[in-house]
């Protein structure tokens, strides 16, 4: 049985998550999507089920499933599986709305720390909605607003129709998260394919930083930022493992997400890795072939010691 793809929908208070969810829950888009949201909105309901753990599940007229929880996320996820396995509901994708002040890290780790959830669900990606009108002020005042951007695989910029010029905001978002592309969404109307198949938590060959890349100093320094490390020389696998272990020992609480492609000395294949806080994985990818071997690593975190991280990898040069 193929695992169920999961998309996390994050964003600060007022960013437009509810508007986007209303679009998902009401449009005739043909997807079989289950949505875990904080509160039910005005949606057309065909049926209502009460799960074993007080998880309220509603089947909607467009075939989507709407689920609200008065308990832990883990229990709600298990309730959905139970209802699906009993044939009471049918869905092949899950979208989870995170609260406006939610820390995305522990929610991500839920899908890697529970055996059943790890087997039955596949975390596809994190989508962050950003209010173009108020984002700068929110990110200045609340580190959590920056963190939501830092964890994202894709960023959806909302309210651009009333915000005016967003170029500086886009530059700031790119400094926080160098790997997430930025899209514009107006009133929640978006091609749902932009929400899905990000492969954000899969080991894949596409490890690049967003373009253009900015090198000027921001007027206000972000607490959350991204560091892109590029190496044009091979590294020893045991030495790079030591560097990563030391980074995790020292800065695991600050590291949010990291992803990379490594040129390992003496190996014809590329080594891919990705991680969230203390959890990470690595695997061999395809041969380099005609591509010039190199290493690219992207670290996103809170007040990361950039000089120390760069020096640690520079020390791998032989």
Regions found by a protein language model. Give the residues of each.
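Nucleotide-state-sensitive switch-loop elements of NTP-binding domains
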Residues: 2-138
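Charged, alpha-helix-enriched surfaces in structured cytosolic catalytic cores
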Residues: 4, 15, 19, 68-75, ...
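Structural motif
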Residues: 86, 118, 144-147, 219
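Short amphipathic alpha-helical segments
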Residues: 92, 223-227, 295-297
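Flexible active-site lid/hinge loop adjacent to a nucleotide/diphosphate
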Residues: 132, 136-151, 155
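C-terminal accessory "lid"/substrate-recognition subdomains
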Residues: 147-289, 302-318
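C-terminal engagement modules used by replication, chromatin/transcription, nuclear envelope/ESCRT
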Residues: 290-300
């Amino acid at each position: 049985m193929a695992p169920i793809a999961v998309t996390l929908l994050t964003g600060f208070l007022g960013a437009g998550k509810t508007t986007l969810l209303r679009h998902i829950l009401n449009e005739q888009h043909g997807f079989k999507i289950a949505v875990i949201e904080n509160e039910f909105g005005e949606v057309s309901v065909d049926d209502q089920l009460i799960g074993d753990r007080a998880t309220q599940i509603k089947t909607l007229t467009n075939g989507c499933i709407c689920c609200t929880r008065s308990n832990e996320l883990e229990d709600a996820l298990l309730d959905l599986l139970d209802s699906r396995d009993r044939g009471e509901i049918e869905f092949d994708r899950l979208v989870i709305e995170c609260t406006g002040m939610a820390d995305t890290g522990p929610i991500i780790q839920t899908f890697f720390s529970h055996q059943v959830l790890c087997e039955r669900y596949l975390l596809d990606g994190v989508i962050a909605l950003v209010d173009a009108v108020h984002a700068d002020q929110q990110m200045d005042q609340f580190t959590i607003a920056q963190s939501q951007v830092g964890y994202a695989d894709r960023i959806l910029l909302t309210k651009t129709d009333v915000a005016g010029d967003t170029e500086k905001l886009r530059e700031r978002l790119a400094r926080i998260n160098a790997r997430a592309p930025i899209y514009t969404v107006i009133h929640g109307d978006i091609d749902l394919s932009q929400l899905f198949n990000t492969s954000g938590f899969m080991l894949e060959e596409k490890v690049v930083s967003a373009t253009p890349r900015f090198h000027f100093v921001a007027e206000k320094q972000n607490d959350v930022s991204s560091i892109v490390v590029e190496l044009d020389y091979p590294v020893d696998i045991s030495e790079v493992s030591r560097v990563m272990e030391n980074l995790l020992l020292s800065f695991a609480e600050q590291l949010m997400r990291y992803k990379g492609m490594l040129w390992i000395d003496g190996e014809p294949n590329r080594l891919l890795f990705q991680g969230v806080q203390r959890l990470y994985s690595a695997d061999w990818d395809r041969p380099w072939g005609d591509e010039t071997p190199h290493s690219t690593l992207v670290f996103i975190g809170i007040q990361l010691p950039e000089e120390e991280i760069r020096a640690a990898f520079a020390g791998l040069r032989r």
